[in-house]
């Protein structure tokens, strides 16, 4: 089953910076001081400069494809494809302007031709097409200039050669979507090596490129049945390296979006391979620091699995409880949101298995001093389906959360949270008034016993303190008392001389 992905937008071309001057060797200070300030973000750069062909011949415009007879069409098409395989330096804004314009016009014409003209895609042009695409898009991505790059706050490095690169991606996409496209011919050239290099490009910092790659990889997955297992396997490897080794990969969200539509098309019953992917890859992905960048796509994949096989619910929820964040409130709010999505599709028979540990965690969230965490946890009681599950299992859920709700209603600093807790307690009272009264009496008795124990503990410590003081005073009194001197014994002379 194939999900229609939205086409990428066509943004404007970014400005290309010039090359910074290099100081002569005798002026280089090997012991220059490092500034403690954070460096200003540099503008876009790319590995395109390393692919520039400095000794290339000047490009000249070729005739339009629509102006030549049909007998010469494919020869001219091959010449234009070869022309589009010439690379230019986009870091120099004024270099080879004529050649860049000739290539841009040729790419535009190829895009229109492959999308509108029938009978163009014959077998002999396939190697030329794949060669042109490969030369343009496959390159070594530059290392990130900012090792602490935050996708939510920092501006990404944009690809300077995007005016040409976008047209190449658009041509590739229309090539795959053309009615004349023959997967049986293309599979000789779009092989495992090609797919692996395509997946490596997902680490590009340019979001425009990743958007095109997402759509193209989805089309490749749909067209080439023999590559499907390989694509899934390589995605697994990327995710596992991201979790346990690199902790940085720019295209996680896009790959998860593709996998979401792939999971949606899985046949039932699910294969063991697919279940292992959920347990060993998707669940551990929740432990990554940059979860907020791709959490929406990750949660969608998890929910898709549970809709396919409800028996996986216990593994998923216990896995989420295992990776539940302890110190990051933003991630905690995301976990609560995902948990509500899971509970929206959970089967009542599966809810019984996880209700106690789940609602103990929800109770801990309600008691959080961060009001957004407490508020998000209390919103569970606004969901009608979750509320019906709670009502059916009130004898288990209510004891798990009652003590926390009652205590937080008396102690929380935020009045909104207190009001929400009162509403939840009122709902519980309406669900099962008898159980509510029993828990209230039990809670008050428990508090009285705790107060009594605390009082006894204080009295015990007070008694120990008094005993210590008495012993201290006794020791000091013994030191201050005079020590009696021994009486000397007089030798009896008995009157003898």
From Swiss-Prot:
Q: Which GO terms describe its cellular component?
A: cytoplasm; protein phosphatase type 2A complex
Task: Enumerate the InterPro entries for this protein.
Answer: ARM-like (IPR011989), ARM-type_fold (IPR016024), PP2A_B56 (IPR002554)
Q: Name one GO biological process term.
A: regulation of cell cycle
Name the domain of life: Eukaryota
Q: What is the recorded post-translational modification?
A: Ubiquitinated by CUL3-KLHL15 complex; this modification leads to proteasomal degradation.
Q: Where is the composition biased (Low complexity)?
A: 1-19
Q: Which GO terms describe its molecular function?
A: protein phosphatase regulator activity
Q: What is its main location?
A: cytoplasm
Q: Where is the composition biased (Basic residues)?
A: 34-45
Disordered: region residues: 1-55, 473-497
Name the UniProt key words of this record, in alphabetical order. Cytoplasm, Phosphoprotein, Ubl conjugation
Q: Where in the cell is it found?
A: Cytoplasm
Phosphoserine PTM positions read 32, 35, 44, 46-48
Pfam families per record? B56 (PF01603)
Q: What does this protein do?
A: As the regulatory component of the serine/threonine-protein phosphatase 2A (PP2A) holoenzyme, modulates substrate specificity, subcellular localization, and responsiveness to phosphorylation. The phosphorylated form mediates the interaction between PP2A and AKT1, leading to AKT1 dephosphorylation.
What interactions and quaternary structure are annotated? Component of the serine/threonine-protein phosphatase 2A complex (PP2A). This complex consists of a common heterodimeric core enzyme, composed of a 36 kDa catalytic subunit (subunit C) and a 65 kDa constant scaffold subunit (PR65 or subunit A), that associates with a variety of regulatory subunits. Proteins that associate with the core dimer include three families of regulatory subunits B (the R2/B/PR55/B55, R3/B''/PR72/PR130/PR59 and R5/B'/B56 families), the 48 kDa variable regulatory subunit, viral proteins, and cell signaling molecules. Interacts with SGO1. Interacts with AKT1.
Give the family, as the similarity comment puts it: Belongs to the phosphatase 2A regulatory subunit B56 family.
Which PANTHER family does the UniProt record give?
SERINE/THREONINE PROTEIN PHOSPHATASE 2A PP2A REGULATORY SUBUNIT B, SERINE_THREONINE-PROTEIN PHOSPHATASE 2A 56 KDA REGULATORY SUBUNIT BETA ISOFORM
Q: Return the protein name.
A: Serine/threonine-protein phosphatase 2A 56 kDa regulatory subunit beta isoform
Question: Which gene carries the instructions for this protein?
Answer: Ppp2r5b
């Amino acid at each position: 089953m194939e999900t229609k992905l939205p086409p990428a937008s066509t943004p404007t071309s970014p400005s290309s910076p010039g090359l910074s001057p290099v100081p002569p060797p005798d002026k280089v200070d090997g012991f220059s001081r490092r500034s403690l300030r954070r460096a200003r973000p540099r503008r876009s750069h790319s590995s395109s400069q390393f692919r520039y062909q400095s000794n290339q011949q000047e490009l000249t415009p070729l005739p339009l494809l629509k102006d030549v007879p049909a007998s010469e069409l494919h020869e001219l098409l091959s010449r234009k494809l070869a022309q589009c395989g010439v690379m230019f330096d986009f870091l120099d804004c004024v270099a080879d302007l004529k050649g860049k314009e000739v290539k841009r016009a040729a790419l535009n014409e190829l895009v229109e031709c492959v999308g509108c003209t029938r009978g163009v895609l014959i077998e002999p042009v396939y190697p030329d097409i794949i060669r042109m695409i490969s030369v343009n898009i496959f390159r070594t991505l530059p290392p990130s200039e900012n090792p602490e790059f935050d996708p939510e706050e920092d501006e990404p490095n944009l690809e300077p050669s995007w005016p040409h690169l976008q047209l190449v991606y658009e041509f590739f996409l229309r090539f795959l979507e053309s009615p004349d496209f023959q997967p049986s011919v293309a599979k000789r050239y779009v092989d495992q090596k090609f797919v692996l290099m395509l997946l490596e490009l997902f680490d590009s910092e340019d979001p425009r490129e990743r958007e095109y790659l997402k759509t193209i990889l989805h089309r490749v997955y749909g067209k080439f049945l023999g590559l499907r297992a390989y694509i899934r396997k390589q995605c697994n490897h990327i995710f596992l390296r991201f979790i346990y080794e690199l902790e940085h990969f720019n295209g996680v969200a896009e790959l998860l979006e593709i996998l979401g539509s792939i999971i949606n098309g899985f046949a039932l019953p699910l294969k063991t391979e697919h279940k292992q992917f959920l347990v060993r890859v998707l669940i551990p992905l929740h432990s990554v620091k940059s979860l907020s960048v791709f959490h929406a796509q990750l949660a969608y994949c998890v929910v898709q699995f549970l809709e396919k096989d409800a028996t996986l619910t216990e593994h998923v929820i216990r896995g989420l409880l295992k990776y539940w964040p302890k110190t990051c409130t933003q991630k905690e709010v995301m976990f609560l949101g995902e948990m509500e999505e899971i509970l929206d599709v959970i089967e009542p028979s599966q809810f019984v298995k996880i209700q106690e540990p789940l609602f103990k965690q929800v109770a801990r969230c309600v008691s959080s001093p961060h009001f957004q965490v407490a508020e998000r946890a209390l919103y569970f009681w606004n969901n009608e389906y979750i509320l019906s599950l709670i009502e059916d299992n009130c004898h288990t859920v209510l004891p798990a959360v009652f003590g926390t709700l009652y205590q937080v209603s008396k102690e929380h600093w935020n009045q909104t949270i207190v009001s929400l807790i009162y509403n939840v307690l009122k709902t519980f009272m309406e669900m099962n008034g008898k159980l509510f009264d029993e828990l209230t009496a039990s809670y008050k008795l428990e508090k009285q016993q705790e107060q009594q124990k605390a009082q006894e503990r204080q009295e015990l410590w007070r008694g120990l303190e008094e005993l210590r003081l008495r012993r201290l005073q006794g020791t000091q009194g013994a030191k201050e008392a005079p020590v009696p001197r021994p009486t000397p014994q007089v030798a009896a002379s008995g009157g003898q001389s």
